[in-house]
């Protein structure tokens, strides 16, 4: 069952989402060649707690850390470790924060040093596909309309769309209805409703769509060992239209990137 949120609840969720956004921005200022993912994980936990929140992922289903950190051929759910990042790596960093009874949850894929052109393009297309999908989150549409848009856009570039891992509803629980696949057929799935909040998160592979699970029980990797990309936003339906509650603006500020990609999804301009 889709849980509709009041405007007041959505604003509480926006606060949680923006703590995640700020955490990713802090990570963006620290991430570089030679830094370990475990070090970044500890920084993130401290940052989240300093902002009056609790890391959503720490202990969730038994997960041991605050961040899911998935480099290169890892798709999602990578466990932070002491291996230094290297030039040429790409890494998905997925973060969650729980405050005022509600979760925020979103992700960004970072480039470390000089990244191969084909991998840079994968990240660009995957991020673009996130917004292609978000445009379909509106009254009158259904769940698979979002997935269909993401699938068509990314497969047109020859990429593999992961099937087994999906986005999800978000609220007082980290994972609520509905599941939000990144593939599908138009006109299928649950009908969208006012006040719903979902995490839309394309997970797109440079090669095959197939994945496998690491022996640690968490880490998901591409079956062919080629890179994967992952971007995620929290999005509400307000007045029948999609509104992004999270933002990449803090990441962009740290990286010196200028972008207006989120502007069409905001009723009120974001001030950072």
Functional labels for PLM-detected ranges:
Residues 1-272:
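Active-site neighborhoods and metal-handling regions in enzymes and metal-associated proteins
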